[in-house]
Structures are given as C-alpha cells and as structure tokens.
Amino acid sequence: IINLIGYIDNNTFKNFTIEKMHQSLKINSILPWIIIRMSMQHMRNKKWGKIINTSSIGVDYGGGINSFNYSISKYVNEFIPIEIKKHFKFNIFYNVLKIGITETKIHNKIYNKSLKKRIKLVPMKKIAKPIDIANYIDFLISDLNKFINGQIIKISGGE
C-alpha cells in the first residue's frame, strides 16, 4: 500500500472551517488509514506486507501560509500506532516518507518568484523530481529492504 494522496485546500489558520479541515483529514489521512486497517489481516495471513504513508516536510516548519488543513492532515500520518508495530513480527513493513518540495502539479502552480524563494530554503538548492521519490519508494517496497521499518524518513534535499 502506497499512500501518495496530497489534497490541499489553500486554507489559512485564520479562515479554516471544521468542514474544510474534516475534508482534508478525510482525504489525506482517514481514508488511507481505513485501507491500511482493512489490509492488515490479509498481510498478516501472507506473512508479508509493505505500507508507505506520506507526510510533508512543511510539518516541521509549521506548514505554509495557505496549507493549514493540509499540514495537520499530513502530521497525522506521522503517527505510527502500536497496533501497526505489533504486525512487524509478521514481516509487515510500515514507513512514512516526509517529502520535501517536489515538482508536482501543486508546486507548479506556485508563481516562479515564490517557488524560487522556497527552493532557496532547501540546502541542496533544488526541487525534487517525482522520480527521486519513486526510486526511494521502489527501494522500500523491494526485497532489498529487510530492516527499515517503523521509520519517518525525510526525502527533502537536506531540510
């Protein structure tokens, strides 16, 4: 299971509503957790499973001005419940990728001036390509990964 959902509603702390926050939580966090929960018994029976959930590097910095609901929903994904950890002994892997600024439709909508300013904050001074994230996911779900489990892993150019 790979959760790469990234719904953002451009709400600030000043203007968020319960309904909008619930929408972000439902899409980015609750629905993926339901899928994970529904899959656990099958993975346990097979004695194998790989789960990758995602968060955002913005969580470490209080999120962006227009991403209050998004940031909270991604922060929720960093929680690794004890119920998941109990399944590790059945060869089930669960990791969270905390992804930095990446060349996606969301970031391509940011004006060039704002995007350049944001990239300057990244120690590597560049934006990740989708293939950078895909390669890391490929490793984590491959047979090469035999011991990285229960981790929050940053893919953020040094942030």
Language-model segments: what does each one mean?
Residues N91-F93, I148-G150:
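Short, small/polar-rich loop/turn modules that mediate ligand/substrate recognition or access, typified
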Residues Y7, K14-I34, W48, I52, ...:
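Catalytic Tyr-X3-Lys loop
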Residues V122-I133:
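A conserved structural motif in NAD(P)-dependent oxidoreductases
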Residues Q41, I82-H87, K146:
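Alpha-helical segment proximal to the catalytic Tyr-Lys
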Residues T12-F13, K20-H22, H107, R118:
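Substrate-binding pocket helix/loop in short-chain dehydrogenase/reductase
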